């Protein structure tokens, strides 16, 4: 539940779901909404895959999924799971034995696709492997790979077919007394995706893995995911998420956090508030923001920074941020600290100075949080 007593219009009541564990990461219940991505290297190239997993983890990924299409990939999972700093989800399609092998290799979770994993007997074997090796399971329903009998029944992929597929497989797992599972309802169509999740929310308390599948390239996929996932999250639906892009997995993680930050559901790093710039700007806003985004990537402390080109909105925005800079005249602007006007700074020195002030503010916030924790003990 995200409640703001001062600004109640920002409150989000999260759907009540049960909590499971993906490795050491809680998903569902009152746990933070986690951000995932998926590697796009050859899994058999363990070193390249591990390198990509580490890069994603450094960007903030809580969980990383790795495809296991064949026996050689399953063997590589031993090293990948051992070296990964975050829990690994094994992505399983068609070959149920790959799921068993991935569990044995150390995967924290097995993603199975109801449309191609096979019959109940095969699912039972996967469930046994998951239980034996302390794995959770994701039931990953996808509009593009629904079961044949559901396509015949409904005529085409649709929310009803997706929900029926998911509920059938929930029953399969529960019949095997297995409850450490989450479920996803993914389609490339945001309307279908949203409708499926909304219908499913009334039928199960399983945690939801969220995503708009095959969303597209960086720009189009970001917009699609922000609209589709943003609306569901705003409605309180969702426990873990992946932004699917035809792009670097690190970019998926960044966009995922930006969506959560925009809704006040999770905070990580510097939230930069900047204007689009116009003829009134007292400095090059666009270039400045580009540089600051790169130079402040190392800051993990949740905080806000306003970079506004002129005095129309600059002072007002700065009052609501930890650090702010508002363009003025004569090659300088005003620096704001903790919502208060502080001092002038030249445009030439502004970037270095802002980085320094953000770092100082981050240290102060961390120190305050540590002191509060110690006082509470």
Swiss-Prot record:
Coiled-coil regions, chain positions: none
GO molecular function: 4 iron, 4 sulfur cluster binding; 4-hydroxy-3-methylbut-2-en-1-yl diphosphate synthase activity (ferredoxin); 4-hydroxy-3-methylbut-2-enyl-diphosphate synthase activity (flavodoxin); iron ion binding
EC number: 1.17.7.3
Known cofactor(s): [4Fe-4S] cluster
UniProt pathway annotation: Isoprenoid biosynthesis; isopentenyl diphosphate biosynthesis via DXP pathway; isopentenyl diphosphate from 1-deoxy-D-xylulose 5-phosphate: step 5/6
Major enzyme class: oxidoreductase
Residues of the signal peptide: none
Binding of [4Fe-4S] cluster, residues: 275, 278, 310, 317
GO biological process: isopentenyl diphosphate biosynthetic process, methylerythritol 4-phosphate pathway; terpenoid biosynthetic process
Catalytic activity: (2E)-4-hydroxy-3-methylbut-2-enyl diphosphate + oxidized [flavodoxin] + H2O + 2 H(+) = 2-C-methyl-D-erythritol 2,4-cyclic diphosphate + reduced [flavodoxin]
Superkingdom of origin: Bacteria
Free-text remark on how the cofactor is bound: Binds 1 [4Fe-4S] cluster.
Pfam family, one: GcpE
Keywords, comma-separated and alphabetical: 4Fe-4S, Iron, Iron-sulfur, Isoprene biosynthesis, Metal-binding, Oxidoreductase
Recorded family membership: Belongs to the IspG family.
PANTHER family associated with the record: 4-HYDROXY-3-METHYLBUT-2-EN-1-YL DIPHOSPHATE SYNTHASE, 4-HYDROXY-3-METHYLBUT-2-EN-1-YL DIPHOSPHATE SYNTHASE (FERREDOXIN), CHLOROPLASTIC
Function: Converts 2C-methyl-D-erythritol 2,4-cyclodiphosphate (ME-2,4cPP) into 1-hydroxy-2-methyl-2-(E)-butenyl 4-diphosphate.
The name this protein goes by in its record: 4-hydroxy-3-methylbut-2-en-1-yl diphosphate synthase (flavodoxin)
Species: Jannaschia sp. (strain CCS1)
The encoding gene: ispG
